[in-house]
Amino acid sequence: MKRLLPIAAAIAALTTASMANRLAVPVIVGGEQDYDACGSGGTVEGLNPRGDGFLAVKAGPGVNFERIDKLYNGMQLYICGEQGDWFAIVYSQTGSWSERCNVSTPWPRAMPYTGPCRAGWVHRRWVGSLAG
């Protein structure tokens, strides 16, 4: 049993590192002393329930990046940046705004988002602005 503990710890560390490195293009948050780390919020809307019914969260701003998650109509997210038609987002697993994401307060320095919530890129066509 004692031999398995170091192995389990190493596997947990590798899993955490691989989750943090899933984004090919990091979501950058912060950089403003007087403004929230992510400047606005939105909600997923307009998805066809008879289609695939989800909005693909991508590892970067484009269709050729890996899909890393799925979002559904009504889910809320923080919009932290944009590149072309793509929003850089932070979102909680519950699909609602969460204080624990820590992006609704100022971050004086701009830096890649590493958690505790999820981050990625979504096409702006399926995001309606709610706040910000």
Feature roles, as predicted:
Residues K2-A8:
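Sec-dependent signal peptide recognition
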Residues T16-A20:
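Sec/Tat signal peptide C-region and signal peptidase I cleavage site
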Residues N21-G42, V90-G132:
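Boundary regions of SH3-family modules and the immediately adjacent low-complexity/disordered segments
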Residues A59-N73:
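SH3/SH3-like (including bacterial SH3b) beta-barrel domains
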